[in-house]
Curated annotation (Swiss-Prot):
The active site is at D120 (proton donor). Keywords: Cell cycle, Cell division, Cell shape, Cell wall biogenesis/degradation, Cytoplasm, Peptidoglycan synthesis, Transferase. This is UDP-N-acetylglucosamine 1-carboxyvinyltransferase. Belongs to the EPSP synthase family. MurA subfamily. It catalyses: phosphoenolpyruvate + UDP-N-acetyl-alpha-D-glucosamine = UDP-N-acetyl-3-O-(1-carboxyvinyl)-alpha-D-glucosamine + phosphate. One of its GO terms (cellular component) is cytoplasm.
């Protein structure tokens, strides 16, 4: 992991070939670390990714009174009998996932103060559904001085229906309700594999949960949870990024460490674009021997096409044969990436939450800036398809979500270097 001012120099033209294995999911490990707050004792997480956000979450947990050790891919969390309830220190504001301590703290302490989180600049992501869910469980919530405050003498099960299948709200409500009195039903719950992973861990801690992976989750509250050991699910977004990188560079890449069913729609889309895709139990292979065909995409909550792979869909269509439309239905400001693609020569136009991409034969090199984790990765892969050498700046965003990104690309044959500022 590098510094804030590091940049990448990416020379285009290489055909990616070889194999790569994905680590545990960023969108899972941070929530699992928060779930460790629910039980006094030592919880161990394995297959953790070596990304910037894991030490940031460690700092959040340490600020709440935990002891946390990171040893390569293993994170060990020692949760005390008495937690601090106020997560209103600088580490909390640095990344979005810090808000997932709201539910566990309310459940354990009867009170939580969580600073409004930072993270990627990809649109408004309000906490209304998080707060509403806690209120339906019996808490009072308010926003004051840049923080969410939740208080509850006790939490009581409720029938909760989400307006939108928000991943973050589903996670916070799950963690708040596992020790609530009585039964909670959560309708229109998020169905993402990372939700299933969280429920698996909570169940191994003694929680009574049914229905994860479906739109309705039922939680029967228990009096107490116990610590556990848990292996983090593989990162489907990183795996999907490698899949698109193979297709865009007309490469041949085998990706391991991920169940291909978690990427069913992205892999089907790559087939439509002309790629050969072979799947096996714990991975897949993508081979592309020709220029991709333009393919329309629309992002939706799982099992739809993931918004986190939207930059890769735009990048693929930028060099494809034909015209395509990519529609963003999840985050309204995620097309900032398009401005940077235009610097690379992409022929695009934005209309509301649609972007029209007219494919060209080859992109051109320039200097571009990452605005978030996935946009940064998308720009690097697009630069691999450009003539000449592209400078990618603000790559600290990429370090937040992609372990050993440069090293993995180099192993696949890419000409990429990190320049340390």
């Amino acid at each position: 992991m590098g510094g804030v001012k590091d940049k990448f120099l990416v020379k285009g033209g290489a055909r990616l070939q070889g194999s790569v294995r994905v680590d545990g999911a960023k969108n899972s490990v941070l929530k699992l670390m928060a779930a460790a707050l629910l039980a006094e004792g030592t919880t161990t997480l394995t297959n953790c990714p070596e990304i910037l956000d894991v030490p940031l979450m460690r700092d959040v947990l340490v600020g709440l009174g935990c002891e946390v050790e990171i040893d390569g891919h293993t994170v060990t969390i020692h949760t005390p009998a008495e937690l601090k309830s106020d997560a209103d220190f600088p580490a909390v504001t640095q990344f979005r996932a810090s808000v997932c301590v709201l539910g566990p703290l309310t459940a354990r302490c009867g009170r939580a103060v969580v600073s409004l989180p930072g993270g990627d600049a990809i649109g408004s992501r309000p906490l209304d559904m998080h707060q509403s869910g806690l209120e339906q469980l019996g808490a009072t919530t308010r926003t004051q001085h840049g923080a969410v405050v939740a208080e509850a003498d006790k939490l009581v099960g409720a029938e909760i229906s989400l307006d939108f299948p928000s991943v973050g709200a589903t996670e916070n409500i799950l963690m708040a309700s596992v020790m609530a009195e009585g039964q909670t039903t959560l309708d229109n719950a998020a169905r993402e594999p990372e939700i299933v992973d969280l429920c698996r861990m909570l169940r191994s801690m003694g929680a009574d949960i049914e229905g994860e992976g479906s739109p309705k989750i039922t939680i029967n509250g228990v009096e107490k949870l116990h610590p556990t050991s848990h292996e983090v699910i593989g990162d489907r977004i990183v795996a999907g990024t490698w899949a698109f990188a193979a297709a865009m560079t007309r490469g041949d890449v085998t990706v391991g460490g991920i169940a291909p069913r978690y990427l069913h729609l992205p892999l089907e889309k790559l087939k439509l674009a002309g790629a050969q895709v072979d799947t096996f139990e714990n991975g897949f292979r993508v081979v592309m021997n020709k220029r991709p065909k333009s393919t329309d995409y629309q992002t939706l909550p799982f099992p739809g096409f993931p918004t986190d792979l939207q930059p890769m869909a735009i990048g693929l269509n930028a060099i494809a044969d034909g015209v395509a439309v990519v529609t963003e239905n999840v985050f309204e400001s995620r097309f900032r990436f398009v401005d940077e693609m235009q610097r690379l020569g992409a022929d695009t136009s934005v209309d509301g939450h649609h972007v029209v991409i007219r494919g060209i034969e080859e992109l051109s090199s320039t200097t571009v800036w990452s605005s978030d984790i996935r946009a940064g990765a998308g720009l690097v892969i697009a630069a691999l398809c450009a003539e000449g050498t592209t400078e990618v700046r603000d790559v600290f965003h990429i370090d937040r979500g992609y372990p050993n990104f440069v090293e993995n690309l180099q192993a696949l044959g890419a000409d990429i270097q990190r320049v340390v500022a």
